A protein has these predicted regions:
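Extended, polar beta-sheet/loop recognition surfaces of beta-rich domains
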Residues: 147, 196-237
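Flexible, surface-exposed loop/linker segments and immediately adjacent secondary-structure boundaries
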Residues: 25-43, 49, 54, 64-140
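Surface-exposed, short loops/turns at beta-strand junctions within beta-sandwich domains
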Residues: 179-191
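Short proline/glycine-enriched turn/loop motifs at strand-loop junctions of beta-rich domains
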Residues: 55, 146-152
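Sec/Tat signal peptide C-region and signal peptidase I cleavage site
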Residues: 19-25
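Bacterial N-terminal signal peptides
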Residues: 8-17
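Solvent-exposed serine/threonine-rich low-complexity stretches and specific carbohydrate-binding patches
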Residues: 159-178
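Short edge beta-strand/loop segments characteristic of extracellular beta-sandwich folds
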Residues: 138-148
Length: 237
């Protein structure tokens, strides 16, 4: 009797686990939405119809890193065939980066130059050039400059110059960790001066729903953090 009970309990637990996995796999994450009240980072069920009116546009990411772009008018399910299958994250990441960067380069729509330096770690913030940098949610900000360099005075300010932080970059080091006292915010542009060079850097935080490297790569390709995508691919090999 006890053995039968344990067997039934195990089957029930397996069914619940598989059902939860399938539900998670069907979730898509919003990257961008125009004309409709969907926030970046929001999750939607890909198996259910998404009503879009004329002119409304939504860009979504699947758990495998697939980028799904929908244009209204439409009332279709974004990913009706999403199931509970296991995602090969490394394989999906390699395929995504290869295909998306090649396709977008041909179309001239990659946000960020292809020859920009690739950071040795994906989440280092390159402050030597203008552009967008991506970070996981609640990840510490670490500035990076290729090749290190000499001692340099550093200033950080929001675009409206409402505050200013001063610090020092030591000679021979390529990284400068920022403390929690520097109030950096998501999707805000900051003017950063290192020595005599000034750049404008926009920080974009990836939501927790972007939960694997294939999804992170897809997100970063869409917002323009291309060198970081290449670094992520190198780290996954």
């Amino acid at each position: 009797m006890l053995a039968r009970f344990l067997t039934m309990a195990a089957v029930t637990l397996l069914a619940v686990t598989m059902g939860a996995a399938a539900a998670r796999a069907a979730n898509l994450v919003v990257v961008e939405a125009r004309g409709i009240d969907l926030k970046p980072g929001a999750e939607i069920d890909g198996s259910k119809p998404l009503a879009l009116k004329d002119g409304q546009v939504v860009t979504l990411i699947s758990p495998s890193g697939e980028i799904i772009k929908l244009h209204g008018p439409s009332n279709a399910a974004p990913a009706p065939s999403q199931g509970g299958s296991t995602v090969d994250v490394k394989g999906a990441l390699r395929t995504l980066v290869t295909q998306e960067l090649a396709d977008n380069s041909e179309l001239g729509v990659v946000r960020g130059a292809a020859d920009d330096p690739v950071p040795p770690q994906p989440w280092l913030v390159d402050v030597t050039r203008d552009g967008t940098r991506c970070l996981p949610a609640n990840y510490p900000v670490v500035f990076w400059r290729p090749g290190g360099g000499g001692a340099s005075a550093v200033t950080i300010a929001p675009y409206d110059r409402s505050w200013l932080v001063r610090t020092e970059w030591q000679a021979g080091t390529d990284r400068l960790p920022l403390g929690a006292a520097v109030p950096l915010r998501n999707r805000q542009t900051y003017v950063i001066r290192v020595g005599n060079k000034e750049t404008a850097v926009t920080l974009v935080t990836m939501p927790a729903a972007v939960s694997n490297d294939a999804m992170r790569a897809a997100w970063m390709i869409q917002v323009g953090c291309v060198p970081q995508v290449k670094s992520l691919l190198q780290a996954a090999r």
